[in-house]
Amino acid sequence: MKFFALFIYRPVATILISIAITLCGVLGFRLLPVAPLPQVDFPVIMVSASLPGASPETMASSVATPLERSLGRIAGVSEMTSSSSLGSTRIILQFNFDRDINGAARDVQAAINAAQSLLPSGMPSRPTYRKANPSDAPIMILTLTSDTWSQGELYDFASTQLAQTIAQIDGVGDVDVGGSSLPAVRVGLNPQALFNQGVSLDDVRSAISNANVRKPQGAIDDKTHRWQVQTNDELKTATEYQPLIIHYNNGAAVRLGDVATVTDSVQDVRNAGMTNAKPAILLMIRKLPEANIIQTVDSIREKLPELQTLIPASIDLQIAQDRSPTIRASLEEVEQTLVISVALVILVVFLFLRSGRATLIPAVAVPVSLIGTFAAMYLCGFSLNNLSLMALTIATGFVVDDAIVVLENISRHLEAGMKPLQAALQGTREVGFTVLSMSLSLVAVFLPLLLMGGLPGRLLREFAVTLSVAIGISLLVSLTLTPMMCGWMLKSSKPREQTRSRGFGRLLTGLQQGYGTSLKWVLNHTRLVGVVLLGTIALNIWLYISIPKTFFPEQDTGVLMGGIQADQSISFQAMRGKLQDFMKIIRDDPAVDNVTGFTGGSRVNSGMMFITLKSRGERHETAQQVIDRLRVALAKEPGANLFLMAVQDIRVGGRQANASYQYALLSDDLSALREWEPKIRKALAALPQLADVNSDQQDNGAEMNLIYDRETMSRLGIDVQAANSLLNNAFGQRQISTIYQPMNQYKVVMEVDSRYTQDISALEKMFVINSDGKAIPLSYFAKWQPANAPLSVNHQGLSAASTIAFNLPTGTSLSEATEAINRAMTQLGVPSTVRGSFAGTAQVFQETMNSQVILILAAIATVYIVLGILYESYVHPLTILSTLPSAGVGALLALELFNAPFSLIALIGIMLLIGIVKKNAIMMVDFALEAQRNGNLTPEQAIFQACLLRFRPIMMTTLAALFGALPLVISGGDGSELRQPLGITIVGGLVMSQLLTLYTTPVVYLFFDRLRLRFSRNNSQPESITEP
C-alpha cells in the first residue's frame, strides 16, 4: 500500500520519472544502429592458395590436404570445406558463434605458417586468408566501364586504386574484383618457328627470365660524392621484349619476335565481366561477419565522392547493386506498422472507456513503455531491425494491458462513489498482484529463448529481451504513473449501466449478458467442455505434426543471385556467349532493373550473375514469382543452366552452392562417392518437392591423357621433368617473370599462341631439346588419348565431399523437401561408405526442428514454476495454463488457412500466445480466489462472478492485443513476408482462445477445486478446503 501511495500522492515526481525514462529512450533511439535482422553471422574465414597450371587433383592432394590438416587443429572450427580447381584451392572455415573472428584469424595465420614446409615449392605466393564468407551475397557491387580503356587497364585501376581504398572502410571484409585480370605481357609462341630455329620453350623462358632481372647494383663513393648505380635491366612493355635475343642459330640472332607474338594483354584471358549488355569490371564488396550492413554501405557511399576524384573522366563508375534500399524500406514499413498498431490499440481502449480523459491514461503508458525500451536496447548492443521492431509492435497490445486492468478496476470503485485518490489506491492494491503475475509470467515465457544456443537463439534473443524490457517498463508505469493519473484526472461518476445506453456500450452489455447466460449452461455441462478441452490438445498435436515447416520465411529482398553451370567440356569462348545469352533473357524481363555477371578463372564452365529487381511498388510479382517466370525462359538455353535464388538476409555455411539449400555427401572412398553421387542427384531431381537440383561434383571434364614411354625417353636423353616443363610452358599460361611498377607488380605470361591450339593436333607440334641438343617431337616418346577428369575436387573435413544443392518449388515447404530426400536416400540403399547429411540452412532447420517442442515445453514449465511461486499453489497454475491448447489450435489453423508454413517466426508467435492467453485466466482466477476468501462464496459462485466482472477487461485486453497484431497480418510492402507469419499466428490464437477459454477456464477451475476438496477429505484435512 505504501509503495503505491508513494507515487499516487507525489504526482510531480512520478511524472518526472516517466519523462526521464522517455528521454533516455529517445537518446537510445538516435544512437541505435539499423540492420535487417539481429547479428547472426557465423565467423567465417576463407583461405586461398594458387599453383598455376596444377590440376584439381594435384591442388587437392598437394595444397588443400596439408592446409586442412593444419587448419583442422584450430579450436572452435565448426565446419571446414574446401574446393580445388585448376590452379587454385579455396578453404572455408566456419567457427562457432562464440569465437572471436580476430583471434581466429591469428590462429589461421599460424596454421598456414605451420603447413608452409609441406606445400609445393613452385607456388607463386604463400596462401592468404580473408575474414569474409564467399557464399554471402555482396552488400554492394560497383561497375567500371569505359569506351577507351581496355578491360585489363580497368581491372588494374580497380584493384590497385579503388579496391584498396574500399577495403580500408570499417565493416568491409572483402573486395573481389572480377571481369578480367591484371595487365601482363603475353608471349604467344609459334611452335613451328621454334622447331625451325631449334629453340626449346625452356630456352625462351630462361632467356626472358634472365633478361628481366631486378637486382641491387650498389653505389660508388669518392671523396665528395656518392653515385647510385642503376641499369636498364628491366623490360616493361611488349615492344621492349620483341627484339630480345633468345638464341643464336648458325651465328644468326634469333629474336623473341621471330618465334612469338608479344602483346600487352592480361594475365588470364579466360575472364569476362558484363553489366547489362556492356563489358565491365565488377567490384563485389562483402562485409565482415560482425559488421552492420547499413553502416558499412553508408560508409562506402560517403567514400564514393572521394573515389570519383581519382577516376579519369573516360571511366564510368556506377553502383550496379545496393542491398540497403530494400532493408531501409522494410524497416520503414515495420515502423509504419508500429504506429498503426499503437493507434488501433488506443482506439480499442477508447471504444471501451467512452472517455477521452480515461483513454489518455493508458495511451500515455504505451509511448513511455515503448520509447523507454530503446534505451535498454542500446545498452544491450541491439539494433533497430525487423525482429526488434516487430517485438515493439506486438508489445503495443501488451503494455496497454496492465494499464487497462488498473484503470478498469479504479473506474469500478469510482462508479461505486469512492473518491478519486482513494479509488486509485484501493484499485491498484487489489489488482497489483494480478498485474505482477501477468507480467512476470509473460516474461517467463522468454527465459528458454534467452538460454537457447546456436543461430535460432541468437536470432530470437533480441526479440525476447526487447519485448521483456517493454513489459517490465509497462509494469512499472501501470503501478506508478497510471494510478497517479487516475487519481488526479478521473472523477467519481454514475454506474456504467446508467451511462452506457447506445452504440458500442449497448453491444458490450449485450455480449456480457449473453456470456453470463451461456456460461451458466456450460457450468451445467462440464463433461462436454472437458471433452472439448481434451480434443483441442489432441488437435494441437495432429496439426503440429502435419503442418508444413520451414526455417525462416522466404524473403523478397529485391535481389537475385544466379549460378551458371555449363557442360563440363565447354570452352571459354562458348561460355562467354552463354553468359551474354542468359543476361539478355533476364534483362528483357519487365521486373528486372539491373543485371551484372562474370565468368572465367579457374572454372571455365561456371559463372555468377547478380540481378536487381525493381522496387515492390514498380513490380507486381514477388521475387519467387519472377524466378518461376524466368526459369521457363532460361530452360530453353541449350548446353548450360542458370539457377536463380532470392538473396536472403540469413544464409548459413560457406559453400558457394547454386541454390538456397544443400545436402552434403561424404565418403573416405572417392570412387564410391563418384559412383553414387550421380545416382543420388538423379533421384533427387525427380522429386516434385525439389527444384533446380544441381551438384558441385564435376568429374566429366574433357582431358587429354599423355602416356610417356619411359624407355624411349631414356634412350633419347629426355627426362620426365623436361617433358612436363614443356607442357606447362606451352599450355599453362606460365608466369615466367615479374615486371615491377610503382603501383603494382605485373607478370610476363608465356604459352603457345591460341592460333596453334585450336585442336588436339597442337600436341604434335610440341618438341623437347634433348641432352644432345636435338629437337625431339613429343609424339616420339608419348602417346595421348582423351579421358574424363574432374574440374574440381571438394572436401569436408578430411573426407571427399559432394554437395547437392536445391531450391523449393512454389508452395513446397522445407520440411516436405527434407522428408522427401530422406525417403529417397532410404529407397536407394546407399552404402554405409557414403554418408549423407543436410548442410547450411537445411542443417540448422533440422536442428531447430528437433528442439522446437522442447522449447515450447520449457516455456510452459517456466511459466508454471513462476505462477506456482506467485500463487503458492500446484493447482492454480494448471488452471491458468489450460488456456494454451485452444490458442495453439487457433494459431496452427490460421497458418494452414493462409498457406503459411510453420517457421521460426511462427514459433515466436506460439511463445507469445503462451504469455498472452493466460492473462484471461489470471484475471478470472485472481478474482475468484479473492471472492472465496473475502466474500464467503462457493467456488461456483466465485468463478461465475469473476467471469462476469472481468469480462470487460478481458475483452479489452484481448482486443488490444489482437488489434496490435492485426497490422502485421494485413501489411504489405518490403519485409511483409517476415511480419505476416507472426501476425497470423497471434491473431488466430487470440480469436480461438477468446472463444474457448471464457468457458474452459471456469470449468477447469471447478474441476481442480473439487479434486483438491476430495484429496483433502481423503487425507482428513478439511480445514485446507477454504485455503486459496
Curated annotation (Swiss-Prot):
Cellular component aspect of the GO annotation: plasma membrane
Transferase among keywords: no
Signal peptide: none
Keyword Transmembrane: yes
Topological category with respect to the lipid bilayer: Multi-pass membrane protein
Keywords from the UniProt entry: Cell inner membrane, Cell membrane, Membrane, Transmembrane, Transmembrane helix, Transport
HAMAP family named among the record's database cross-references: MdtC
Family of this protein: Belongs to the resistance-nodulation-cell division (RND) (TC 2.A.6) family. MdtC subfamily.
PANTHER family attached to this UniProt entry: MULTIDRUG RESISTANCE PROTEIN MDTC (PTHR32063:SF34), PTHR32063
Protein name: Multidrug resistance protein MdtC
